[in-house]
């Protein structure tokens, strides 16, 4: 079973949690896109959902495949969000934002009664941090914000390169008009402390640590999909 087949297995398992008539947050990334494709097949057969996309990219795919969409202002309370992750630890703490949609992903997840994370087994880790942590920042005062992030990291005993994410024509810009600093800390032993410290920096719009948000993680491997439940 290759990586895409594992993503499809995880998406299939998540789809079993989606009920007719649900208000659904729809994530961003390659695994979430497999979920959208499967959801679209059910919608074509008469299944009713209203989706809120977490990125313009997801919105375009949903429109292309016929998944009905609303804005979060139109559906401010959601039943369920299904989204991928860049890393998942045993406590269902996540690193997200590799696709650049972390702010909207977090807003949509917070507006949902439940969040289900879908991923292949390569994303399951003992401790977060091997994947660079995306930190969404305001373009104004970028150097000052970067220095503040470096100071936070030093206080917490973290080190590693901070890289301003690039795209084909310069700095990567999020759907909200912000930039992303990717922090390669290597290992984050206290994700809660780092989350709190980053939230205290005025120039940090949001970061990719999702803590106490996922209710379930569906992890797919060669033997199939298994479900991890949050213990809190």
UniProtKB/Swiss-Prot annotation:
GO terms for molecular function: ribose-5-phosphate isomerase activity. InterPro entries: NagB/RpiA_transferase-like, Ribose-5P_isomerase, Ribose5P_isomerase_typA_subgr, Ribose5P_isomerase_type_A. SUPFAM superfamilies: D-ribose-5-phosphate isomerase (RpiA), lid domain, NagB/RpiA/CoA transferase-like. Signal peptide: none annotated. The keyword Nucleotide-binding does not apply. Pfam families: Rib_5-P_isom_A. It catalyses: aldehydo-D-ribose 5-phosphate = D-ribulose 5-phosphate. The active site is at residue 105. The keyword rRNA processing does not apply. Pathway: Carbohydrate degradation; pentose phosphate pathway; D-ribose 5-phosphate from D-ribulose 5-phosphate (non-oxidative stage): step 1/1. Its EC number is 5.3.1.6. GO terms for biological process: pentose-phosphate shunt, non-oxidative branch. Keywords: Isomerase. Substrate binds at residues 28-31, 83-86, 96-99, 123. Belongs to the ribose 5-phosphate isomerase family. PANTHER family: RIBOSE-5-PHOSPHATE ISOMERASE 3, CHLOROPLASTIC-RELATED (PTHR43748:SF3). Homodimer. Catalyzes the reversible conversion of ribose-5-phosphate to ribulose 5-phosphate. HAMAP family: Rib_5P_isom_A. This is Ribose-5-phosphate isomerase A. The gene is rpiA.
């Amino acid at each position: 079973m290759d990586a895409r087949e594992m993503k499809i297995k995880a998406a299939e398992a998540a789809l079993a949690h989606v009920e007719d008539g649900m208000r659904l947050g729809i994530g961003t990334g390659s695994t979430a896109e497999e979920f959208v494709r499967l959801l679209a097949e059910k919608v074509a057969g008469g299944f009713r959902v209203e989706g809120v996309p977490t990125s313009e990219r997801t919105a375009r795919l949903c429109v292309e495949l016929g998944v009905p969409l609303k804005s979060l202002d139109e559906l401010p309370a959601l039943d369920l969000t299904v989204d991928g992750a860049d890393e998942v630890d045993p406590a269902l703490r996540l690193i997200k934002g590799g696709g650049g949609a972390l702010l909207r992903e977090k807003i949509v997840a917070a507006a949902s009664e439940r969040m289900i994370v879908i991923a292949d087994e390569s994303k399951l880790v003992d401790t977060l941090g091997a994947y660079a942590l995306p930190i969404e920042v305001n373009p104004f005062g970028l150097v000052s914000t970067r220095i503040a992030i470096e100071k936070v990291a030093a206080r917490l005993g973290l080190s590693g390169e901070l890289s301003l994410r690039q795209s084909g024509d310069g700095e990567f810009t999020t759907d909200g008009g912000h930039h992303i600093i990717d922090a390669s800390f290597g290992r984050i032993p206290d994700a809660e402390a780092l989350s709190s410290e980053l939230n205290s920096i005025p120039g940090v719009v949001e970061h990719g640590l999702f803590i106490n948000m996922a209710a379930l993680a569906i992890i797919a491997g060669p033997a199939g999909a298994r479900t991890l439940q949050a213990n809190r």
